[in-house]
Amino acid sequence: MKRLIAIAAVAAVLGTGSLAYAGSLGRPCTDAGQDKWLAVEALRGKLLALGYTVRKGKLKNACGEFYAIDKAGNHVELFVDPTNGNIVGTL
C-alpha cells in the first residue's frame, strides 16, 4: 500500500510540472509591436501551405498559437512568430 501511495505521489508531482508549460511556449515569439503582426488568418494560410490542417488558432503572449494536424496525422500545437509566420516551437 505504501508503494502505491509513493508511486501516486511521484506521478502527481511529475504531472503537474508538465502542466505548467502545456499550452505555452514559455517565452514570446517576437518582440515586435502588434502593428507589425500578421492577422490570424494570414498565419493560418502559411501553416496550410506547409501542409498542416489547422483546427484552431489565436494570438497569445506575442505568439501565434495553433492547434493542428501534421502531414503524418499527429496532433500538434504550433507556436508561430506573428510577424512572419515562422514556426518557433511545437508541443
List the predicted regions and their residue ranges:
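Conserved histidines in hydrophobic membrane contexts and catalytic metal-binding motifs
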Residues: 47, 60, 66-69, 79-80
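Short, non-transmembrane alpha-helical segments in secretory-pathway proteins
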Residues: 30-54
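Glycine-centered tight beta-turn/hairpin loop motif at sheet-sheet or coil-to-beta transitions
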Residues: 71-73
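A short, surface-exposed beta-strand/turn
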Residues: 76-89
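Surface-exposed patches in mature extracellular/periplasmic domains of secreted proteins
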Residues: 54-60
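Classic N-terminal secretory signal peptides
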Residues: 1-21
